[in-house]
Amino acid sequence: MSQPELKKSKVDISKTITVLPGDHVGEEVCNEAIKVLQAIEDATPYRNIKFNLQKHLIGGAAIDATGTPLPDESLEAAKNSDAVLLGAVGGPKWGTGSVRPEQGLLKIRKELNLYANLRPCNFASDSLLELSPLKSEIVKGTDFTVVRELVGGIYFGERQEQAESEDKQTAWDTEKYSTEEVTRITRMAAFMALQHNPPLPIWSLDKANVLASSRLWRTTVDKVMSEEFPQLTIQHQLIDSAAMILVQSPTKLNGIIITSNMFGDIISDEASVIPGSLGLLPSASLASLPDTNSAFGLYEPCHGSAPDLTENKVNPVATILSVAMMLRLSLDCVPEAEALEKAVGQVLDSGIRTGDLRGSSSTKEVGDAIAEAVKKVLNQSV
């Protein structure tokens, strides 16, 4: 990773971040992310940066306090911020009733038009290769990003449950996509591919041999790529075949993976196992192309709320790397993002790790170490 290029001229930057800790470990990981943001405020040597942090409720915590998983106050705060940092939502306490924590997450995605979910899959440090459930020689060099369409498809389609009797019930969900939705997510994937030199290849995953929605998906992707991005490489892969490749030889899918809401949900969770822990993987959900490094976005770890995990045991790295994505894509703080990613790698290499990475450090100890490391990286680069 290249060293951040920092200039010495003073520039003032003020950014507002809505923090939605959510449930269980969400509060802990958000606290460590805030710690790192404050360290960057203190350390950035060539400009004054101020992160205005505002905490609000979402998920089960919001249900307990207000009866709704996404209070209007939380939504309005998110709409008026530069970016949103989310911890995790859900847990068995709230069950699967008519009001559920996950409804808050679905609603905020829809209300903020967060149509593109980006989930990188790589190794923050080669020292983590041995932790993968796959052989090191198979996973070494894995580096792809899943670009998942987030506000369409079967999760937002019409659904129905009918019961003629206790023994005879029927239920269905509807998968629906428009050319506009597929065009928009294809452009996001192409933009991400073009941020690299040479540009990254793009893999489009669907089930076009069976589903009408996938056939529309494939023809639309082809049209957009041929007309707008002829310089990029696009390959189509059936989702079941891609799931197999991901286990057999994940580096074959290196580049940008574009897929629908449900397929993206499944394939990105499968991919999250490759680095050895969900506690390592960040994500970003964007409302527009980050072409000026100022796209509005929501950032969260790929892991859930982990209600069974005792205090100070959760790995904060995924949330901290989500902050790095936020700095790069939404807050126009690219040098700070690079410094933070470098700091995370240094800390992991030093052996300061939580239990999921066969370490003995606590959540706070990892957060403290990364905060100190990013200060040193920033100050050394002047």
From Swiss-Prot:
Xref: PROSITE patterns: IDH_IMDH
Gene Ontology annotations for the cellular component aspect, listed alphabetically: cytosol
The protein's Enzyme Commission number: 1.1.1.85
Keywords: Amino-acid biosynthesis, Branched-chain amino acid biosynthesis, Cytoplasm, Leucine biosynthesis, Magnesium, Manganese, Metal-binding, NAD, Oxidoreductase
Swiss-Prot/TrEMBL cofactor(s): Mg(2+); Mn(2+)
Catalysed reaction, written as an equation: (2R,3S)-3-isopropylmalate + NAD(+) = 4-methyl-2-oxopentanoate + CO2 + NADH
Domain of life of the source: Eukaryota
A Pfam family that the UniProt record links to this protein: Iso_dh
Pathway per the UniProt entry: Amino-acid biosynthesis; L-leucine biosynthesis; L-leucine from 3-methyl-2-oxobutanoate: step 3/4
Residues bound to Mg(2+): 240, 265, 269
Location in or out of the cell: Cytoplasm
Keyword Magnesium tagged: yes
Binding-site residues, NAD(+): 91-102, 304-315
GO biological process: L-leucine biosynthetic process
Binding site for substrate: 109, 119, 148, 240
GO molecular function: 3-isopropylmalate dehydrogenase activity; magnesium ion binding; NAD binding
Principal subcellular localisation of the protein: cytoplasm
Gene3D superfamilies: Isopropylmalate Dehydrogenase
Annotated positions for site Important for catalysis: 155, 207
Comment on bound cofactor: Binds 1 Mg(2+) or Mn(2+) ion per subunit.
NCBIfam families reported in the protein's UniProt record: leuB (TIGR00169)
Family membership noted in the UniProt record: Belongs to the isocitrate and isopropylmalate dehydrogenases family.
Oligomer and partners: Homodimer.
Alphabetized PANTHER family for the sequence: 3-ISOPROPYLMALATE DEHYDROGENASE
Function, in words: Catalyzes the oxidation of 3-carboxy-2-hydroxy-4-methylpentanoate (3-isopropylmalate) to 3-carboxy-4-methyl-2-oxopentanoate. The product decarboxylates to 4-methyl-2 oxopentanoate.
Protein name: 3-isopropylmalate dehydrogenase
Source species: Debaryomyces hansenii (strain ATCC 36239 / CBS 767 / BCRC 21394 / JCM 1990 / NBRC 0083 / IGC 2968)
Gene, per the UniProt record: LEU2
